[in-house]
UniProtKB/Swiss-Prot annotation:
It comes from Escherichia coli (strain K12). Belongs to the cytochrome c oxidase bacterial subunit 4 family. Pfam families: COX4_pro. One of its GO terms (molecular function) is electron transfer activity. This is Cytochrome bo(3) ubiquinol oxidase subunit 4. It is a multi-pass membrane protein.
Length: 109
C-alpha cells in the first residue's frame, strides 16, 4: 500500500498572509480601544469608528485567516457564507422587530 500525497483540498495561507492579517487585526483593535480610553472624539464618532473597524476586521479575518475569495473552485464556501449572513440578518432584524413591537404594544396600555 502506498500513501497518496495528493492534496486536492483548499490551499493553506502563507506566513505572509497570516502576518498581514495579524498586524491588521491588531491595528483595527487598537484604534477603537485608544479612542474609547482617551475620549478622543464624541461618543457618536467613537461608535461609528468602532462599527466601521469591526466590519473591516471581519473582512480581514475572512480573507486572511479563512481564505474566503471569489475563485470558482471555492464557490461553495462563498455560497455557504452568503447563506449564513442572510440567515443571521433575518434572525437579528426579526428579533429587533419583534422586541420593538412588543415594547410599543406593552406601553400603549
Amino acid at each position: 500500500m502506498s500513501h497518496s500525497t495528493d492534496h486536492s483540498g483548499a490551499s493553506h495561507g502563507s506566513v505572509k498572509t497570516y502576518m498581514t492579517g495579524f498586524i491588521l487585526s491588531i491595528i483595527l483593535t487598537v484604534i477603537p480601544f485608544w479612542m474609547v480610553m482617551t475620549g478622543a472624539a464624541s461618543p457618536a464618532v467613537i461608535l461609528g469608528t468602532i462599527l466601521a473597524m469591526a466590519v473591516v476586521q471581519v473582512l480581514v479575518h475572512l480573507v486572511c485567516f479563512l481564505h474566503m475569495n471569489t475563485k470558482s473552485d471555492e464557490g461553495w464556501n462563498m455560497t455557504a457564507f452568503v447563506f449564513t449572513v442572510l440567515i443571521i440578518a433575518i434572525l437579528v432584524v426579526g428579533s429587533i422587530w419583534i422586541m420593538w413591537n412588543l415594547n410599543y404594544n406593552m406601553m400603549m396600555h
